[in-house]
């Protein structure tokens, strides 16, 4: 999931080290270490956290199931795995770590689009469950507009900085 997410970040026009970092170690007030998958930098010192570690083992079992009953059982397990990951991610409280200046939510990236679609189709309440826990489920398709918005914010920030510099030089 992490490699696919990084490709998605790059496709959106974001650059590692400038617009985002991977596997950043952050310590909380107690000194405990946290390791979000990706921290997306936003203008004005803000950050957005994306996690990409959701298990797709049960979804793969559903895809290869030989009977409808096996498929249904595997899809139920897939939905439980996604819900459990939402709950675990929410408990990490990444958005409130010191220095994060993050919105009060984390994006949970599901790298396999059909796995995302299936869980959204069969467990409609799961998105709301995540939202209430400050975890927003995203796939490549739903994440891309968010990342393009971030890239556009950086272009505007860069243009504004250049305009200020030109204005300051003109005033000298």
Q: Where do the language-model regions lie?
A:
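Amphipathic, heptad-repeat alpha-helical coiled-coil/stalk segments that mediate oligomerization
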Residues: 1-172
């Amino acid at each position: 999931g992490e490699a696919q997410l990084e490709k998605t970040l790059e496709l959106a026009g974001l650059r590692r080290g400038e617009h985002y970092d991977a596997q950043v170690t952050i310590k909380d007030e107690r000194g405990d270490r946290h390791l979000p998958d990706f921290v997306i930098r936003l203008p004005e010192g803000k950050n957005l956290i994306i996690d990409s570690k959701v298990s797709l083992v049960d979804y793969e079992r559903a895809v290869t199931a030989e009977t409808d009953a096996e498929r249904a059982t595997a899809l139920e397990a897939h939905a439980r795995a996604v819900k459990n990951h939402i709950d675990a991610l929410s408990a990490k409280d990444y958005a409130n770590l010191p220095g994060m200046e993050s919105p009060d939510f984390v994006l949970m990236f599901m790298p396999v689009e059909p796995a995302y679609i299936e869980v959204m189709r069969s467990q409609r309440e799961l998105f709301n469950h995540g939202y209430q826990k400050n975890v927003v489920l995203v796939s490549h398709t739903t994440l891309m507009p968010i990342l393009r918005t971030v890239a556009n914010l950086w272009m505007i920030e860069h243009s504004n900085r250049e305009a200020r510099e030109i204005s300051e030089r003109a005033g000298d």
